[in-house]
Amino acid sequence: MILNWRKVIVSFLVIILTNFYNISFTHAESYKWEQIPLNTDEILLDIGFVPDQPQRGWLLGTRSTLFETTDKGKTWELRSLNLEDDKYRLNSISFSGKEGWVTGKPAILLHTTDGGSSWSRIPLSNQLPGDPALITALGTGKAELATDIGAIYRTENSGQTWKAQIQEPLGVIRTVARSENGSYVAVSAKGNFYSTWKEGDDKWISHPRQSSRRIQSMGFTNNNRLWMLTRGGQLWFSSNDSFDEPNWEGPKTPEGKVGFGLGLLNLAFKTPTEIWVSGGSGILLSSQDTGNTWKKETSTDNIPSNFYKISFIDKEVGFVLGNQGTLLRYVSL
């Protein structure tokens, strides 16, 4: 009798695991991603390309790390900014034409008008609330700056003067993102709640988190709706683009439904329907149907790195940024 029960249990487990791996962890083609060697062990934080020079791009990281590529990311050369020391955590880069901006902490702002051949440092006021966290180039001489406590400023004269966009900052935040239409979403330091702001508002609007799980990061879809990654590997999408009263679709679980999660950290859309999610311990997942089914990328299993950021510069080329100088390049074959 005991033996029969053991057979039933074993058969049941086999069925569950087989269905789980077939549905949630179907392996993606491993040849799509390649690791690019870099002469650094620093954490890589952001990447940006020059629209007027599409082969040219820049890669940022901790300890003032700056790399340049002229072949669309196949190879990279370390560049020096000639700063007084290497203490800066360069965390955001953005270009419009050949004009570009780089921010970092402690507070630093760099500006270029020639695609990065030369960089000039723009002084920031000691009264700036917080340190720069996100920079967005908006056109000739125009940019928008968000700090790590939710202050937002805009310049229209190449950084000579800045105008505050909100009356008061939000408080310490863990992540901040900007949509194509100029709206922002920020996650509180502990992930307990998130806040939104759109142009014309005089303050942030705070919202409770959607589930009992703390928020890891948030951002915007291609149609300016919200996405949310929570602890334990859940992914949420808003069903509308209303910031005042966002509605949320049921959670998706890219890593499966067995009850574990390695920690999902960032998300990027390659196309309107193809999504890639990166996370800790070399986890990389993709969906071809806007998150309904997922595949696990196996070529990154043995890379000892957390994948902090994933970014696609077009439909053919994308990058994953991690710690210990880890850089992956996506090539559409």
From Swiss-Prot:
Signal sequence range: 1-28
Gene3D superfamilies in UniProt: YVTN repeat-like/Quinoprotein amine dehydrogenase (2.130.10.10)
A GO cellular component annotation in the UniProt record: photosystem II
Cellular compartment(s): Plastid, Cyanelle thylakoid lumen
Keyword Plastid: yes
UniProt-listed GO biological process terms: photosynthesis
Pfam families in alphabetical order: PSII_BNR
Principal location listed in the UniProt entry: plastid
Keyword 4Fe-4S: no
Keywords: Cyanelle, Photosynthesis, Photosystem II, Plastid, Signal, Thylakoid
Family the UniProt entry places it in: Belongs to the Ycf48 family.
Notes concerning its domains: A 7-bladed beta-propeller torus, about 55 by 55 Angstroms, with a depth of about 25 Angstroms and a central pore.
NCBIfam families per record: PRK13684.1
Functional summary from the UniProt entry: Essential for photosystem II (PSII) biogenesis; required for assembly of an early intermediate in PSII assembly that includes D2 (psbD) and cytochrome b559.
Name of this protein: Photosystem II assembly protein Ycf48
